[in-house]
Amino acid sequence: MAEDSDADKSEEPTAHKLEKAREKGQIPRSRELTSMLMLGAGLAILWVSGESMARQLAAMIAQGLHFDHGLISDDKQMLRQIGMLLRQTLIGLIPIFAGLVIVAMAVPMLLGGVLFSGESIKFDLKRMSPIAGLKRMFSSQALAELLKAILKATLVGWVTGIFLWHNWPDMMRLMAAPPVAALGDALHLIIFCGLVVVLGLTPMVGFDVFFQITSHIKKLRMTKQEIRDEFKDQEGDPHVKGRIRQQQRAMARRRMMADVHKADVIVTNPTHYAVALQYNETKMSAPKVLAKGAGAVALRIRELGAEHRIPLLEAPPLARALFRHSEVGQHIPATLYAAVAEVLAWVYQLKRWKREGGLIPKKPEHLPVPEGLDFATEESETD
C-alpha cells in the first residue's frame, strides 16, 4: 500500500506544502557543501594570517622549551607560565574558530534560507522506533550516503596521496630548515594541499547539492487528491480568499487597462470617474464598456487615453451613470443609448474634421441622462 501511495504522488509540492515543511524544519541540507566551504574558509584564514600565526607558534615553542631553574622550583610560577602559553594559543586560534563558526551558520542558508524551527528538536517517539530505524538504515537515502562517504574518502585519499608524492622532497627539506622558515613553508604546503582537496571535492559537492534538493522535493510530492484537498482547505481561509480576490482584481485591472487603446471615446467626470467606450456598428449591437474606474484608476485611464490620442469628453452626469450602471466588457444600459449616441456622433464629426478640416465640432452639452441614473454626489472611490 505504501508503494502504491508513493507511486500516486506524481505532482510537484505546492508552495503551501513547501512552507509547511519549512515550518517543521524540513529543508534541503548538504553536509558536504558545509564541510567544503568550512575547509575553504579555514584555508583562506590561514592564507591571510598564517605567517603571523606561524611566528607566534615558533615563539611559543621556543619559550616553552626554554629551560628555567626558577620555574622548576616554583609551582605557582610554572602554572602561570603554562596558563600564559594556553592563553596565547587560544588567542591565536580565535580567528580560525570564529571564521569557521560564521561559515557553519551561514552555509545552510544557501539552500534552505534562515530557519529557526522548534519542530526539528521536539521529542518524537517515532524517531526512537527500532523498525523505523532499520528502515532508515536500509533506505535508498542511507545507501546514497554510504556511497557518498566511500567516494569522498577515496577522493580525498587519492588527491592527498598525489600531493604528498609530488611534494615529498620539499617536505624532507623542512627538517633542515630554521624553525620559523620551516613552519612558514609547512603552512604553505598545508594551504596548497587543502586547496587541491577543495577543488577535487567540488564536483561531488555539486552533485550532492543537486541530490539533496531533488530528494527533498521528491519526499514532499503530492497526489492529485492532496492538491484538491489543500485547495479546498485554503479556500476557507479568509486570508487566502482575500489574497485570491486581490490577485483577481489586479489581473482584471491589467486586462482592462490593456484594452483602453481600443476605445473610441473616454467619458470623464472630470476628476472622479472615467469610462472608456467602444462602438463598431458592423460588429456590435450597442456600445461596449472597455474600462472604467474611479480615483487613481480613472486618472490612469485618462493618461492612457492621452497617450493613444483618444478623444476625452467631460460629461459628469453621463460618466457617473456609466460608472454605476455598466460593467466592463458589457454593453451600456439601453436607457443611456441616446446620450451615448450624441457622444459618438461628436467623435465621428471630430474624426472627419481631423481628415478634412473645417470648423471644430462643438462638444455635446446637456446630454439626456435619465433621472435616477445620475448620482450627483461625487465620491472618491477606488476600483
Curated annotation (Swiss-Prot):
Q: Which NCBIfam families match?
A: flhB (TIGR00328), PRK12468.1 (NF009117)
Q: Spell out the GO cellular component terms annotated for this protein, sorted alphabetically and separated by semicolons.
A: plasma membrane
**Its biological purpose:** Required for formation of the rod structure in the basal body of the flagellar apparatus. Together with FliI and FliH, may constitute the export apparatus of flagellin.
Question: What's the name of the protein?
Answer: Flagellar biosynthetic protein FlhB
Superkingdom, according to UniProt?
A: Bacteria
Regions crossing the membrane: 33-53, 91-111, 146-166, 187-207
Gene of origin? flhB
Basic and acidic residues: compositionally biased ranges: 7-27
Q: Which UniProt keywords apply?
A: Bacterial flagellum biogenesis, Bacterial flagellum protein export, Cell inner membrane, Cell membrane, Membrane, Protein transport, Transmembrane, Transmembrane helix, Transport
The biological process GO terms on file are: bacterial-type flagellum assembly; protein secretion
Which parts of the sequence are annotated with region: Disordered?
Answer: 1-27
- Location of this chain's protein in the cell: Cell inner membrane
- Name a Pfam family for this protein: Bac_export_2
The record's annotation in InterPro entries points to:
FlhB, T3SS_substrate_exporter, T3SS_substrate_exporter_C
State the family it belongs to: Belongs to the type III secretion exporter family.
* Protein's membrane topology: Multi-pass membrane protein
Q: Organism, per UniProt?
A: Yersinia enterocolitica
